[in-house]
């Protein structure tokens, strides 16, 4: 796996740039949400929130909608925070539902996906924001990116 490290503030998590093709989605998305998010990202002209992915298996932990947008925009790379899935609390959005990290790993290996809004990940610390121009993410040559932190992500 090639991970182009991005320079970030030392008090924040670090994100890197990975090919969207390397990341494995494990949950379906809401097409209307994808369309709305794509419009927001195009209007902003930059990527403002890294996707989170499991550091070894590269399955998406959170933000399947952004991954879908990256594919639709044919981005060659995207900001990703790599995490150990055991360091993230996993819950179910569904009342009475229970989901475990082992089930998510199994789904990633199977190539199938959970239904939309099955998994909910709770992060102990906030995730970083970034401000990466879309033209840098669609460029065919690797580049180092120094993100600019914003108050919130789109």
UniProtKB/Swiss-Prot annotation:
Keywords: Plasmid. CDD domains: ParB_Srx_like_nuclease (cd16400). Gene3D superfamilies: Conserved hypothetical protein from pyrococcus furiosus pfu- 392566-001, ParB domain. SUPFAM superfamilies: ParB/Sulfiredoxin. InterPro entries: ParB/Sulfiredoxin_dom (IPR003115), ParB/Sulfiredoxin_sf (IPR036086). This is Uncharacterized protein y4yB. It comes from Sinorhizobium fredii (strain NBRC 101917 / NGR234).
């Amino acid at each position: 796996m090639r991970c182009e490290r991005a320079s970030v503030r030392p008090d924040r998590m670090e994100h890197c740039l990975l090919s969207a093709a390397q990341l494995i989605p494990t949950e379906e998305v809401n097409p209307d949400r994808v369309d709305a998010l794509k419009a927001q990202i195009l209007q902003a002209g930059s990527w403002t929130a890294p996707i989170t992915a499991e550091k070894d298996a590269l399955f998406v932990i959170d933000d399947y909608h952004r991954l879908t947008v990256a594919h639709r925009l044919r981005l060659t790379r995207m900001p990703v925070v790599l995490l150990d899935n055991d360091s993230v609390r996993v819950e179910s959005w569904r009342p009475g539902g229970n989901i475990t990290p082992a089930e998510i790993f199994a789904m990633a290996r199977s190539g199938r996906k959970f239904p939309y809004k099955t998994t909910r990940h709770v992060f102990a610390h906030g995730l970083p924001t970034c401000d990466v121009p879309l033209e840098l993410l669609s460029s065919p040559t690797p580049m180092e990116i120094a993100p600019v932190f914003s108050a919130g992500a789109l």
